[in-house]
Curated annotation (Swiss-Prot):
ATP 1 binds at residues 637-644. It is a multi-pass membrane protein. Pump for glutathione S-conjugates. This is ABC transporter C family member 10.
Length: 1453
């Protein structure tokens, strides 16, 4: 039945070449119609034109309209008479008639609405279409039996096409003012190609205004690629994206569709994020789908032409010049295939770019809206992973999307061609293909499972990496690097197990699908043998050619499955995140401030809870509060009483479960933990506001920043590091205060802002900032510093989530027992050494300001944050060698490459055996098939060896590279973290490492495979027809030159892409960390817009990179088409019988796949060149200059060192970088063993630097520190830090349990931990938790108050019981009552230890043995506190006088 159908479709089998020609005519007609449609739809914004030569267009319209109409009538007539004519004949005539009418309508009637360049290009294509159709019709009329009427109509197409050409060029007069000429990119610019006009036309990509020819040929990229060959590209050299690809456009469309879907579904249903995303890109998906369809149709013409060519070689030509015609058709079919495939891939990449941009933008916006419960589920590191890994994986999926259906479609067409070649034996081929797919089905399910496991384990490892990198200073201080590194290594090993499973399945799939053509061929030929179907060169090599063209898409099935699974898992994770609950206004209402209204905040019977409604007892209960404008309200209470939660409730962070809360006007917020952005000090203060010089200067003065800025290299333009790592805690807090003050808000919420600054600065800030600058504002200030309380209009006393007392200071002091205990506790901590107040309290301030130099810790060159390293020029072989040298991976790569070469040689031997013996009567068919199968099986064995070796190399290299990277990062000095943004490091351990794990290993072998296959194809062509070398050698040379020309630009584009990707990650990391502050200042929109800008900055080099890739491939495909056509011409010109038809068929079958092989070769090389940059980027961080060794065996201190804790500091000099000034300038002093040492000085005077030197976080450039006779510079840093104890200024908790945070090394029993918790006033709090010591501590310890976090840090020190303990203002964030208990605990637990206290509170050091005063990096004085207080010129004495002057004045109010 199928045989009869084929006969009715094509007619006589002996005229199959005519059938092929007709089939190609149908393809060309459809292509031209689609091209016309595209011009009509997408190129219809014309410049102004004046009509001219109307008669010419009228004549053309009438003449061509008549021809087209007659073609349609003839086609319908032939259709009715199909019992006597082949089906394909009426189809050709109908399509030709429709195409001609459509083109005529556009050129002659609608031409005034089409771009000039597009109109002229269409007329040129129409002319060639008419010319070819006329020639073919005349040829068929002479040598065949074509219809006479159709011949006449086809001949008339030629004059008709000339009329269309004239109509396009002469039928209109165009106004050139607004038109971009088709050839404008060729002529624009000066001799260097870089005139101002050609300089990307207002920074927008040339793609935005490219004509049809320029779009199809990627001509618009010429200027950028040329520029990349003249100079190394920089970010500013890359044009901006056109509007359609910008993140703002993509996200706006996403939001519109989301709103529309919500409106349709109603409030009860959540719209599908996937559906909304597809709605944003469906047009481009359809367009790319059409190009995919055209590519499949064009590629399917190859085997048909090959079959016709072999028939001609056997002497069965239908007419004299049939071979030449077939060669020309072969060339044009390959060119159409190239154009279609390039546009298919290019437009899919655009879809991927848009999806990636809109998802990244959506993640950025969503994270600014997450409520507390959502943040507990989606940690900061996970959010980073969604944007930096998952969004990129989804962005890659559209590239593979059409492979899901084109593979099946191409397979169906191939089966049709195979049936024409070998008849019913095709069913054997189909059975093997189905069996192959069925074998892959369970593997696909396993792959899905393993991929999910891999992504989950990757998340866990990234979370641990992020936590360790963020808190690296704490890890070094506690000497916990090795333990946390082992935790990460353990998670990495779990990840590697999943990676191995994924890669082994990928290897299995590769073997399965690469070997399937061998088994398909063997099964088919065996069926032919048993069914006595003759095997001839024409049907065998038509079969082989068809199979060679099908096998590449079939081989891609594993990749398609893998990418689809990855995208599915990634999309589900992002969708879950985007659907997470957001902050709700609830009962919180913001109202405009009116002139008559004096109320700033009104809270009525409100309760607030961090958890879900009704799930637990509310964190704040029965809160009623009114704050008026101009009123200053202090909030105090013990640790964990709910002070910070109250501020969070007013900000809307803590959900209101009952009651109401109203506020009037704008809010400014200062968090307890300072949040600083990477950038200049001015940027941090302005925070997006407009510069007002007067207000700005006043803000600097009121925030006590003026003296600090005077000493900075560039003043307020000095760049500060990520999270303000190069600033002291006090400086960061004052920048926060300046940011809030500059906003000139109506309501100020200040969360313990003075805990991080010294006593003098705190006093100055309170007077100048709170009482003066904020006069007239509503101020709610959380504080533990009781001495400030008398100045407030009212004081709120909180306990256990309730406001227990609210009144003036004097009233509370008179009647509240709890408040009296609070004040008395403060007086007790202050000690009894009361100093008489000075007569003029302001005088000491001036004197102290004169004495204390504000030398800052940041006195360095203004650019602390280093610009990200970016290699320039050719990467060379270095990164490849670095990758393959890991664990001797080169051995496995060599074996894999050898196996791949053997496989390719085996395929050639297979086909050579078949070509040489298919027509040889002396070789039986059975022998022919058996030898063919045996060679194939040997080749498959080589494939298995190749795949296994690649997986082994992958695992060894991935494990080794990450191990080196992790060791390097954990051994890097703190100066590296101070000058390197976290996002830059995280991009290495996330996206770059993911590429190295998943893409690089198979990328290497695919480059070898595709290069070997291309070489084999060229070799076969050259052996069969050596004359083609005259064409192929220059063409291959041209291909290499084009590739080199391309690589110069492409590598820089990918490097810039990697660098700009870090910008997106950095901004997201900062936004996640500062989300509360951003929301408090209503700056969400500004941060979101900045994220859009950064996404575009990253997307632009990526867009131009993949466009450049298509630019190169299209030119290489043209080269391969020329080589193929030249080979065909050579074969035609050779005398008949020079080569057997078998070898001719073999050569052409390889030639047909040459362009595909060349494309895959270059494409794989390009991908690998881009991927190998990730190895290069990892390598930048695997060879960081390490800090001192952890352990030096020759100089290890005794086990019980230090015994007494005597610290001798001799002429200590510290600078942070070689070119920076000294921060400590010759410090010399001795801390006797068992003494309690207090270190005081103004913020930035060098106190923290001295502590850093003691722990060797920074190495001295001169002098030394000796502890109990041991020079600490001579021993390992682990031995040093593990013997000291510290309670850092910024309390840090890690994700895990209470037990883990107190004892991560598991060195103590539960009983010891409970005992310590009791001493630190945490026992009751932990016991109230359901899980006790196993109670959850989330990332950053955000589910515990700041004071509780600091108590945990104290607990660590008590557990360690070191002979030398350092307290860096350890009690700054706790209330005075708790402070009193803790001071007693420290005195009791560390009675015989050396305790070094960096103090901001003067009372903290009053009971110290000695006090060290530092100013400007030098020792001002060092003596007993009582002696210093008696000295009139003593700096410490003046600080104490200032403190008590302020305290006494407050106490008397």
């Amino acid at each position: 039945m199928i045989e009869n159908y084929w006969t009715s479709f094509c007619g006589n089998h002996h005229t199959s070449s005519n059938c092929t020609v007709r089939f190609l005519q149908i393809c060309f007609g459809i292509t031209l119609s689609f091209l016309t449609l595209c011009i009509c739809l997408f190129h219809k914004e014309p410049p102004k034109r004046i009509h001219q030569f109307f008669c010419l267009r009228l004549v053309s319209a009438l003449f061509n309209g008549i021809i087209g109409s007659l073609d349609l009538v003839l086609g319908i007539w032939v259709l009715r008479e199909n019992h006597s004519k082949p089906l394909i004949l009426w189809l050709v005539i109908l399509i030709q008639g429709f195409t001609w009418l459509f083109i005529n309508l556009i050129i002659c009637v609608r031409g005034t609405r089409i771009r000039k360049s597009s109109l002229r290009l269409l007329s040129i294509f129409s002319f060639f279409y008419g010319l070819v159709s006329s020639c073919l019709s005349v040829n068929n009329a002479v040598f065949g039996d074509e219809l006479a009427v159709r011949t006449i109509l086809d001949v008339l197409l030629l004059p008709g096409s000339v009329l269309l050409l004239l109509s396009a060029y002469k039928g209109y007069r165009f106004d050139e003012s607004g038109e971009s000429s088709l050839y404008e990119p060729l002529n624009a610019g000066d001799s260097n190609g870089f005139s101002e006009k050609a300089d990307f036309d207002n920074r927008v990509s040339q793609f935005a205004k490219a004509g049809l020819f320029s779009t199809l040929s990627f001509w618009w990229l010429n200027s950028l690629i040329k520029r990349g060959n003249v100079k190394d590209l920089e970010e500013e050299d890359i044009p901006e994206l056109r509007k359609e690809e910008r993140a703002e456009t993509c996200y706006s469309l996403f939001e519109e569709n989301l709103i529309e879907q919500k409106r349709r579904l109603g409030s009860s249903c959540q719209p599908s994020i996937l559906k909304v995303t597809v709605l944003c890109v469906w047009r481009e998906l359809l367009t790319s789908g059409f190009f995919a369809f055209m590519k499949i149709v064009a590629v399917s013409a190859g085997p048909l032409l090959l079959n016709a060519f072999i028939l001609v070689a056997e002497g069965n030509a239908s007419f004299r010049y049939e071979g030449l015609v077939l060669a020309v058709l072969l060339f044009f079919s390959k060119m159409i295939e190239s154009l279609s495939q390039r546009q298919w891939y290019f437009r899919c990449r655009i879809v991927g770019l848009r999806v990636r941009s809109l998802l990244t933008a959506a993640i950025n916006k969503k994270q600014l809206r997450l409520n507390n419960s959502s943040r507990l589920i989606h940690s900061g590191s996970e959010i980073m992973n969604y944007a930096t890994v998952d969004a990129y994986r989804i962005g890659e999926f559209p590239y593979w999307f059409h492979q899901l259906w084109t593979t099946s479609f191409q397979l169906l067409i191939a089966l049709g061609i195979l049936f024409h070649s070998v008849g019913v034996a095709t069913f054997s081929a189909l059975a093997v293909i189905i069996l192959t797919v069925l074998c892959n089905a369970p593997i696909a399910k396993l792959q899905n499972k393993f991929q999910s496991e891999l992504m989950t384990s990757q998340d866990e490892r990234l979370k641990a990496c992020n936590e360790s990198l963020v808190n690296m200073k704490v890890l070094k201080l506690y000497a916990w690097e090795s333990h946390f590194k082992k935790v990460i290594e353990k998670l990495r090993n779990i990840e590697l197990k999943s990676l191995k499973a994924v890669q082994m399945r990928k290897a299995y799939n590769a073997v399965l699908f690469w070997s399937s053509p061998v088994f398909v061929s063997a099964a088919t030929f065996a069926t032919c043998y048993f069914l006595d179907i003759p095997l001839r060169a024409s049907n065998v090599f038509t079969f082989v050619a068809t199979l060679r063209l099908v096998q590449d898409p079939v081989r891609m099935i594993p990749d398609v499955i893998g990418v689809t699974i990855q995208a599915k898992v990634a999309f589900s994770r992002i969708a879950t995140f985007l659907e997470a609950p957001e902050l709700q206004g609830g009962e919180r209402r913001r109202k405009q401030r009116s002139e008559g209204n004096q109320n700033a905040i009104i809270i009525k019977s409100a309760s607030f809870s961090w958890e879900e409604k009704g799930s637990t007892k509310p964190n704040l209960r029965n809160v009623s509060l009114e704050v008026k404008f101009g009123e200053k309200v202090a909030v105090c209470g013990e640790v964990g009483s709910g002070k910070s939660t109250l501020l969070a409730a007013i900000l809307g962070e803590t959900p209101c479960v009952s009651g109401t809360i109203d506020f009037y006007g704008t809010i400014a917020y200062v968090s307890q933990t300072a949040w600083i952005q990477t950038g200049t000090i001015r940027d941090n203060i302005l925070f997006g506001g407009v510069m007002d010089e007067h207000r700005y200067r006043e803000t600097i003065q009121k925030s006590s920043l003026d003296k600090d800025l005077e000493l900075l290299p560039d003043g307020d333009q000095t760049e500060i590091g990520e999270r303000g790592v190069n600033l002291s805690g006090g400086q960061k807090q004052r920048i926060q205060l300046a940011r809030a003050l500059y906003q000139d808000a109506d309501i100020y919420l200040l969360d313990d802002p003075f805990s991080a600054v010294d006593a003098h600065t705190a006093s100055s800030l309170f007077q100048e900032y709170v009482m003066d600058a904020l006069a007239g504002k509503a101020v709610l200030l959380v504080t533990h510093q009781v001495d400030f309380l008398p100045a407030f209009d009212s004081v709120l006393l909180m306990s256990d989530g309730e406001i227990t007392e609210a009144d003036t200071y004097q009233e509370l002091l008179a009647r509240s027992r709890d408040f009296q205990d609070l004040v008395n506790a403060h007086r007790e901590t202050a000690g009894s050494e009361r100093v008489v107040a000075v007569e003029n309290p302001t005088k000491p301030v001036k004197e102290i300001n004169r004495v204390i130099s504000s030398q800052s810790k940041v006195l360095k060159p203004s650019r602390l944050i280093k610009q990200e390293e970016r290699e320039k020029g050719d990467t060379g072989l270095r990164p490849y060698i670095q990758y393959m040298n890991q664990n001797k991976g080169y051995i496995f790569f060599f074996i894999a490459s050898l196996a791949q070469v053997t496989f390719a040689v085996g395929q050639i031997l297979q086909n050579s055996w078949m070509a040489a013996n298919v027509d040889n009567p002396q070789v039986s068919t059975l022998k022919l098939i058996l030898v063919y199968l045996l060679i194939g099986l040997c080749s498959v064995l080589c494939l298995m060896v190749r795949s296994v070796c690649v997986v082994i190399m992958c695992m060894k290299s991935s494990a080794s590279l990450f191990s080196q990277l992790l060791n390097s990062l954990f051994r890097a000095p703190m100066s590296f973290y101070d000058s390197t943004p976290l996002g830059r490091i995280l991009s290495r351990v996330s996206s770059d490492l993911s590429i190295v794990d998943l893409d690089v290993p198979f990328g290497l072998i695919f480059v070898v495979a595709s290069s070997v296959n291309t070489g084999c194809s060229l070799g076969v062509l050259a052996i069969v027809t050596w004359q083609v070398l005259f064409v192929s050698v220059p063409m291959v040379y041209l291909a290499f030159r084009l590739q080199k020309y391309y690589f110069q630009t492409a590598k820089e584009l990918m490097r810039i892409n990697g660098t700009t990707r870090s910008y997106v990650a950095n901004h997201l990391a900062e936004s996640v960390a500062g989300a509360i502050t951003i929301r408090a200042f209503d700056e969400e929109e500004r941060f979101f817009k900045k994220s859009l800008t950064l996404i575009d900055t990253n997307a632009s080099p990526f867009f131009h990179s993949f466009a450049a890739n298509e630019w190169l491939i299209q030119r290489l495909e043209t080269v391969s088409a020329i080589v193929l056509a030249s080979t065909a011409f050579c074969m035609i010109l050779l005398p008949t019988g020079t080569f057997s038809s078998g070898f001719i068929g073999m050569a052409l079958s390889y030639g047909l796949s040459l362009n595909m092989g060349l494309v895959y070769s270059v494409q794989n090389q390009c991908y690998l060149a881009n991927w190998i940059i990730s190895v290069e980027r990892l390598n930048q961080y695997t060879h960081l200059t390490p800090e001192a060794p952890e352990v030096i065996e020759e100089t290890r201190p005794p086990v019980n060192w230090p015994v007494t804790g005597r610290v001798e500091i001799s002429d200590l000099q510290i600078r942070y970088r070689r070119e920076s000034p000294l921060v400590l300038k010759g410090i010399s002093c001795t801390f006797e063993g068992g003494h309690k040492i207090g270190i005081v000085g103004r913020t930035g005077s060098g106190k923290t630097t001295l502590i850093s030197a003691l722990f060797r976080l920074v190495e001295p450039v001169g002098g030394k520190i000796v502890v109990d006779g041991v020079d600490i510079s001579k021993i390992g840093v682990h031995d040093l830090r593990s013997r000291f104890g510290i309670i850092p200024q910024d309390p840090t908790l890690f994700n895990g349990t209470v037990r883990f945070n107190l004892d991560p090394l598991c060195q103590h029993s539960d009983a010891e931990i409970w005992e310590v918790l009791g001493k630190c006033q945490l026992k009751e709090v932990v016991q109230e938790k359901e899980n006790g010591l196993d109670s959850l501590v989330v990332e950053d310890g955000s589910n515990w108050s700041m004071g509780q976090r600091q108590l945990f840090c104290l607990g660590r020190a008590v557990l360690r019981r070191s002979r030398v303990l350092v307290l860096d203002e350890a009690t700054a964030s706790i209330d005075n009552a708790t402070d009193l208990i803790l001071q007693k605990t420290i005195r009791r637990e560390f009675a015989d230890c050396t305790v070094i206290t960096v103090a901001h509170r003067i009372p903290t050091v009053m009971d110290c043995t000695m006090v060290l005063s530092i100013s400007d990096g030098r020792i001002v004085e060092y003596d007993e506190p009582m002696k210093l207080m008696k000295d009139e010129n003593s700096l410490f004495g003046k600080l104490v006088k200032e403190y008590w002057s302020h305290y006494n004045s407050a106490d008397s109010r």
